[in-house]
């Protein structure tokens, strides 16, 4: 099986026409710089930037193809984190996180797990440790541990209740891989079966209607704008824990300039013929919040496409640099 990569990219289709609104000082210039940074990239791209109006600054809104559902890979892990913390929402949530032991064994082992390193580690770990591994290192075994604790149906119920209709999560990362490989029993796909499938081809597209990791730029901006402000939590202590974990996101040091408080979890995939990159975030900069999502899905025959990945990251850094300059 082709490697699943947190740093990959995904694709599909021609670039769609875009709709843009931009308001605020330098709005038209910012629009050109942000959208222009991504011009020429292959496949389908989507972007949204929203900075709510403040007492002294008008709203900034820039969108491109923001309502289209695309593959976002591990960026769905922020949904899982949020729902699980909602379930634990209480003034003593920090104690609950450190006191909840989660099983680390073959029932949850998955590929691309650099922290829990299956099959070499077994036992129990605290739920906090699993959450941090899921966000900081995008560990898929940790993800399946937290997803099991939350319940995939509960995560889907949360997304539906929040109006995030373009967002979808699988039963587990391992079930997702089983479906990609065409396993008839993908919902009960075992670690042994996954290991035995190492050289088998991908037969189902990562973006599908059965087991996928998907969202839209609209949904991601809505989710980040609401979750980091505490809309989904009843207790301030839970919001603190959510922000603490999300501030560990592995994409932050890869893409974002210094100077802001960033809460983000990126995602991607690289398989032969299909690639994706997604970076959503909430950023507090110069006493102002902005919310951002940039997604690209594309097709390339090779298992990896480092040239397009490098172009996307350069575009992302240029766009974020322009946004930081505008808000600072």
Regions found by a protein language model. Name each.
Residues 20-71, 319-322:
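Beta-lactamase-like hydrolase cores
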Residues 1-15:
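N-terminal secretory signal peptides and thylakoid transit peptides that target proteins
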Residues 26-30, 106, 121-201, 217-218, ...:
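Active-site-adjacent helix/loop patches that line small-molecule binding or acyl-intermediate pockets
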């Amino acid at each position: 099986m082709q490697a699943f990569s947190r740093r990959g990219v995904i694709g599909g289709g021609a670039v769609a026409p875009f709709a843009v609104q931009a308001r605020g000082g330098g709005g038209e210039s910012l629009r050109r710089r942000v959208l222009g940074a991504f011009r020429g990239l292959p496949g389908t791209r989507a972007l949204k930037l929203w900075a709510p109006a403040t007492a002294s600054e008008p709203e900034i809104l820039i969108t491109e193809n923001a309502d289209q559902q695309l593959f976002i890979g591990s960026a769905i892990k922020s949904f899982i984190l949020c729902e699980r913390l909602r379930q634990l929402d209480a003034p003593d949530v920090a104690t609950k996180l450190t006191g909840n032991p989660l099983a680390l064994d073959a029932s949850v082992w998955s590929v691309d797990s650099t922290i829990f390193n299956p099959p070499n580690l077994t036992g129990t770990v605290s739920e906090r440790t699993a959450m941090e591994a899921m966000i900081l290192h995008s560990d898929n075994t940790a993800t399946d541990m937290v997803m099991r604790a939350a319940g995939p149906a509960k995560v889907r119920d949360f997304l539906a209740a929040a109006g995030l209709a373009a967002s979808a999560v699988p039963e587990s990362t391992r079930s997702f891989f089983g479906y990609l490989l065409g396993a008839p029993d993908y919902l009960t796909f075992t670690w042994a079966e996954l290991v035995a499938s190492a050289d088998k081809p991908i037969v189902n597209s990562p973006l599908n209607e059965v087991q996928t990791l998907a969202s839209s730029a609209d949904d991601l901006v809505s989710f980040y704008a609401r979750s980091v402000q505490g809309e989904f939590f009843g207790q301030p202590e839970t919001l603190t824990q959510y922000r603490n974990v999300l501030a560990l996101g592995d994409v932050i040091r890869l893409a974002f300039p210094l100077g802001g408080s960033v809460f983000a979890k990126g995602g991607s995939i690289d398989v032969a013929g299909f690639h994706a990159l997604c970076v959503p975030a909430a950023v507090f900069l110069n006493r102002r919040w902005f919310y951002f999502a940039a997604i690209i899905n594309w097709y390339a025959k090779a298992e990896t496409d480092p040239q397009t990945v490098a172009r996307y990251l350069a575009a992302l850094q240029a766009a974020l640099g322009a946004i930081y300059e505008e808000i600072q």
